[in-house]
Amino acid sequence: MPDIINIIKGCLAGSRRDQELLYRRHAAKLYAVCLQYSGNDDEARDILQEGFIKIFENLIHYKNEGSFEGWMRRIVVNTALEKYRSKHNLYRVDDIDAIPEPDASPETDDYSGLEAGDLLMIIRDLPHKYRMVFNLYAIEGYSHKEISQMINISEGTSKSNLSRARIILQKKVSLYTGVNKKVISG
């Protein structure tokens, strides 16, 4: 099985076989990322397709520093963010900072009764604006400042959306598991 560097070289040389191999190796994982940011399967497939087009167009810029999968993931996340921005005609709202936030520091707890797939399904049911901030903060590891710049909201709005997402998740997880637990700290 060819290593990733040889596959990248083949893709850069225009090899359809290597492009297909790259796609087949990584499409499932990247599709899961797309599902985190999309409203439905069709939108996730669109993001995946657009993301792979950008991956192939930008392979020349990959510097073989760090994880190639991480590099592709960033492209797919950015593609999802672009789609979100264009779909929602986002503009900055700063006065949301005046709204008091709910408790933003829930504790992490054990979710032994909850499968990862079930948790992802619960996250996917969040309202889109909350899901977007939750994914970027809790899953991708971006700061509120970075999130605010990515999706054109204030840092306060990012914090508020994360807090509200956590409250919703906490309620849904407790309903799902029958136990009152707090959701993912940060």
How does the language model describe each region?
Residues 1, 82, 90-116, 143:
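Internal acidic/polar
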Residues 12-13, 49-67, 87-88:
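Sigma70-family region 2
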Residues 60-64, 74-94, 164:
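Arg/Lys-rich amphipathic alpha helix in sigma70-family domain 2
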Residues 10, 91, 149-152, 166-186:
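C-terminal edge and immediately downstream basic/flexible tail or linker adjoining helix-turn-helix-like DNA-binding
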Residues 23-41, 58, 123, 175:
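Amphipathic, Lys/Arg- and hydrophobic-enriched alpha-helical face
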Residues 32, 46-53, 66-78:
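Structural recognition of an alpha-helix C-terminal capping motif at a helix-to-coil junction
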Residues 8-32:
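A short, charge-rich alpha-helical start-of-domain segment used by transcription regulators
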Residues 121-124, 128-132, 140-157:
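Helix-turn-helix DNA-binding module
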